[in-house]
Amino acid sequence: MSHGPKGDINKQEWEDVEFPSICERCLGDNSYVRMTKEPLGQECKICSKPCTIFRWIKERGQKPGKTQICVGCARYKNCCQSCMLDLQFGLPIALRDAALKLVESGPTNDINREFFAQNQQRLLSNGETAYDSQEASAAARNLVKKVEKRELHSRPPKRKLDDVESKQILKEARASDASLNAERPLFPVKKIINGNVSLSINMEPPKDKKIASLFLIGVEDELADYKIRKHFEQYGPLKSVVCSHRAKCAFVNFKTRSSAEIAAAASPDGNVVIEGFRLKVQWGKPRSLGGPEGEVRNAKLADLVMRGSSHGNKTSQKSTIKNIENEDHENTKSPAVAIPIDPNQPRYRSQIPR
């Protein structure tokens, strides 16, 4: 009499899930995430059982996310399958367990780890869990809150570009100008200090009488094309406004050279404010901004230029405010001071000696 193969209880306990347990930080803000599933694609880093791998891309250009542990261990540890951070406090599970002493570390032997995971899976299926945050003592909870303020879920600040990176971006921009045989560079850089770029803008009309366009730097997404058109129409009729929000730049093309000269004369220092947005303006001949790569490069240069100009404006504003305060102090009259009354001075006429 032949018998079938003996069933393996460990294989019966292998997981087959349709969706992972991931925190919002790892999943990202996109509501339409494309996720791939690979059943039994790896070994869980906690219980060493085969588990399903889920992969996804949070944002374009970033490294794909991936699950590291099985769903059972994630629920038992109350952590994310990808970053393995606690879902309540945002801390590494080893630090959390040491502080709160809620979850045991478990066995280290492979076979014992599988047996331990089976028992925990059975508890979860019955609606029980070994993790209970209410059991934490007040002292341990205060310790976790102190560590939580310094831990991982705060986003790191954006790194500023240094002089080397700024010069590399500028070098690429000059190479693009040379390939187009451009007479005037889009970004006439004067100097670079601490990653900030200052321009040497010359608002004198160019010798080429055919140039009747102005080039704007620092065009944000909130500044629409029609607002730029509305601002410059006061100086004369416009031929077109070519705006690239991705490059943070725009060309304002006038129908006549005289209108362009009037608009340039209105901004002798190369600064213009449109609907509350501060921009840099200079003469420029319309041309391509270099495709997607060139637009990204020009956007970085525009950020460096606007950051450098804002730094200079802050210094000048401080000195201006200080001068205004000094003038106000000089022009302010001293307040009237009441003279104290002598207590021996007679208050009534009858008390005055004759």
Swiss-Prot record:
Subcellular location as annotated: Nucleus
Ranges of compositional bias, category Polar residues: 310-323
GO CC terms of this entry: nucleus; post-mRNA release spliceosomal complex; Prp19 complex; spliceosomal complex; U2-type catalytic step 1 spliceosome; U2-type catalytic step 2 spliceosome
Organism: Schizosaccharomyces pombe (strain 972 / ATCC 24843)
Domain RRM: 212-286
Protein name as annotated: Pre-mRNA-splicing factor cwf5
Keyword RNA-binding: yes
Highest rank taxon of the organism: Eukaryota
Keyword vocabulary terms for this entry: mRNA processing, mRNA splicing, Nucleus, RNA-binding, Spliceosome
Oligomeric form and interacting partners: Belongs to the 40S cdc5-associated complex (or cwf complex), a spliceosome sub-complex reminiscent of a late-stage spliceosome composed of the U2, U5 and U6 snRNAs and at least brr2, cdc5, cwf2/prp3, cwf3/syf1, cwf4/syf3, cwf5/ecm2, spp42/cwf6, cwf7/spf27, cwf8, cwf9, cwf10, cwf11, cwf12, prp45/cwf13, cwf14, cwf15, cwf16, cwf17, cwf18, cwf19, cwf20, cwf21, cwf22, cwf23, cwf24, cwf25, cwf26, cyp7/cwf27, cwf28, cwf29/ist3, lea1, msl1, prp5/cwf1, prp10, prp12/sap130, prp17, prp22, sap61, sap62, sap114, sap145, slu7, smb1, smd1, smd3, smf1, smg1 and syf2.
The organism's taxonomic lineage, starting at the top: Eukaryota, Fungi, Dikarya, Ascomycota, Taphrinomycotina
Keyword presence, Nucleus: yes
Gene that this polypeptide is encoded by: cwf5
Any GO BP: mRNA cis splicing, via spliceosome
Protein function: Facilitates the cooperative formation of U2/U6 helix II in association with stem II in the spliceosome. Binds to RNA. Involved in pre-mRNA splicing.
Any single Pfam family the record assigns to this protein: STL11_N
Transmembrane regions listed in the UniProt entry: none
Molecular-function GO terms, alphabetical: pre-mRNA binding; U6 snRNA binding
Annotated region (Disordered), positions in chain: 308-354
Family: Belongs to the RRM SLT11 family.
